[in-house]
Amino acid sequence: MDASVVRFSQSPARVPPEFEPDMEKIKRRLLKYGVDPTPKILNNLRKKEIQKHNRRTKRETESEAEVYTEAQKQSMEEEARFQTLRREYKQFTRSISGKRGGDVGLMVGNPWEGIERVKLKELVSGVRREEVSAGELKKENLKELKKILEKDLRWVLDDDVDVEEFDLDKEFDPAKRWRNEGEAVRVLVDRLSGREINEKHWKFVRMMNQSGLQFTEDQMLKIVDRLGRKQSWKQASAVVHWVYSDKKRKHLRSRFVYTKLLSVLGFARRPQEALQIFNQMLGDRQLYPDMAAYHCIAVTLGQAGLLKELLKVIERMRQKPTKLTKNLRQKNWDPVLEPDLVVYNAILNACVPTLQWKAVSWVFVELRKNGLRPNGATYGLAMEVMLESGKFDRVHDFFRKMKSSGEAPKAITYKVLVRALWREGKIEEAVEAVRDMEQKGVIGTGSVYYELACCLCNNGRWCDAMLEVGRMKRLENCRPLEITFTGLIAASLNGGHVDDCMAIFQYMKDKCDPNIGTANMMLKVYGRNDMFSEAKELFEEIVSRKETHLVPNEYTYSFMLEASARSLQWEYFEHVYQTMVLSGYQMDQTKHASMLIEASRAGKWSLLEHAFDAVLEDGEIPHPLFFTELLCHATAKGDFQRAITLINTVALASFQISEEEWTDLFEEHQDWLTQDNLHKLSDHLIECDYVSEPTVSNLSKSLKSRCGSSSSSAQPLLAVDVTTQSQGEKPEEDLLLQDTTMEDDNSANGEAWEFTETELETLGLEELEIDDDEESSDSDSLSVYDILKEWEESSKKE
């Protein structure tokens, strides 16, 4: 054998790391074939993979015992020496970059590059800024430049780029240039929760792709959980749908991720969306729900009161999967489950808003059949169902059963008991129940003492209620005093104790500062008890102080408008309405439509016109009272063109006005609607574009019956003379008040009577002067923007 040929069978100097199989890959393989990856199965597969690897390594080692030449041996030694030097260089670089403080600078560039290239990199990367140009580049200038760029380029950066604060005192660390997995998840969650977008938006797709995540099961659980904590359930649903809709990631779908999404939707009180996700899980073998998923959907439906849907879920829980289920490969797979105590408690929770008190007995029978023992929550929910259904005797029965079964009553149980005694009128028994709770060592909660305090205030014992408030203050995690006192004032108002409301309000000022909720409640108290001066004083104080805890909201203006309307203070009503609109709030049609109608009949027609235009500009349908009142006003003025426009609008509305309602409306306004105007309205009704609509046909029938039953020569007390021109011309809009006497010829010609200023003010009309200019018009024709402009100018003058 040649001497230059030697046998080289030694192993390399570097010991290979111990082999560790990829457990995530094993899990995905098991889920793909429908096997539940339990810890025992995973451990056995891990051992087998290690044994397989060891056998393969042994075979490769035996086969590598070959003959190498001197040149090959020298080449391998040089490669080993290079790897050693490379490892030492990495360790040295890591130790240098890890140092902080001192004069240790950052090594930039490569040793073989020129010094000019290194300096250029220093300028570009911002290293050693203080040494550049003798310190002319300062940190303050960089911060100022940052603010200028953010201000000028906000239209580019807004809702697109995350601008994070960077500490200029810290050195730039190349080792931390790229975020790790946790940082990438945090940034993605912050960006998604900061904007309302769905999976179809291009920014959403770009955010997901730029995150650099693989969207494994662990990463998806973290993302969905953190989005749920930020109350971003829409974004959580979008992430799950986008990730698992991709064909490359379909095999990565996880039941646990969908279960986490169910819990997020339940926490956000979105039962319909949760039900859709649950039905999607039922249609796929890979996502088929387990007991944890059934718990999530049951609790969500129970809190929403969807009893029928919850019972359907329980039926599906006991049935085998249908043949339409995807990925159904194992024939002997049987995921049938039986409801447990959590599911039955969810049924009781759903019975509370639906008042299904008979279902309580069925639940206890089912528990007995399945060998389940009711716990404290079961008895407490049963008591609450009976309380809301008015079965107070059964509330006490379940309380006794709870104590006899050995379950210790909790504070929430005593809260239900106190409320039941309150509704029964047993005030002393409610106080004794709370004292009994304290004697038994049950740690009370703020809700128990708050419930008892409201009970006492509702029955005129506010001084005793203050003692319960003192006990509540000593507890942890109790509600703030401002909210507590607001609830006590509301309880006293519901009990009819107005003096107690004011006494509690004065007592509250010594303990804490009233917030806007308390002020709104006092405005409600003053407004509903004819105390306009007190309400006005409090409202002026709220508006003038401009403090953070007393910022007027929509309820503030609403209660003040109600107080002004109840006291017939229409001038101040107009002032409050103007202030509300200038503050950016709009009137609630459902609550204040009747008040606007009363104000318009008192002479404040501009408010009704503004509210009507504002509602139309918002894209909503005005209240039916707005249409009918404006129609009667236009008919009385003789403005039949506007009347026809209103009729065309109301014909396309979602509501309908019957013939009886039209007739009652004309009878209600017979004092200022002439029979002649009704005749003319009936004649102009032919010009309507939607005559066949039910509302318009009912109006036509009512006008025909009204005009046919009365004489056309009959005139009301106040007649408005409207001179109509030929067809196609605009009718006169000025009210002609002429100096006439009560003669028959003037009455026949349709001329108006003359009234004094006091009589006109009483009738709710404004005296208008005759203007020869044809372009002049009264204030009712102003647009919503003109009215707002006048209000702003008047407020500036004040």
UniProtKB/Swiss-Prot annotation:
**Region of interest (Disordered), ranges:** 1-21, 50-73
* Gene3D superfamilies documented for this protein: Tetratricopeptide repeat domain
Q: Which organism is it from?
A: Arabidopsis thaliana (Mouse-ear cress)
Cellular component (GO) terms are: chloroplast
Presence of the UniProt keyword NADP in the record: no
Q: How does it assemble?
A: Interacts (via C-terminus) with SIGF (via N-terminus).
Classification via PROSITE patterns: PPR
Location in the cell reads: Plastid, Chloroplast
- This chain's protein is named Pentatricopeptide repeat-containing protein At5g67570, chloroplastic
Its annotated function is as follows:
Involved in the regulation of early chloroplast development and chloroplast gene expression in a SIGF-dependent manner.
Spans of repeat PPR: 254-284, 290-324, 340-374, 375-409, 410-444, 445-480, 481-511, 515-545, 553-587, 588-622
UniProt entry keywords in alphabetical sequence:
Chloroplast, Plastid, Repeat, Transit peptide
PANTHER family documented for this protein: OS01G0674700 PROTEIN (PTHR46935), PENTACOTRIPEPTIDE-REPEAT REGION OF PRORP DOMAIN-CONTAINING PROTEIN (PTHR46935:SF2)
Pfam families for the chain: PPR, PPR_2, PPR_3
The family note in this entry says: Belongs to the PPR family. P subfamily.
Give GO BP annotations, semicolon-separated: chloroplast organization; plastid transcription
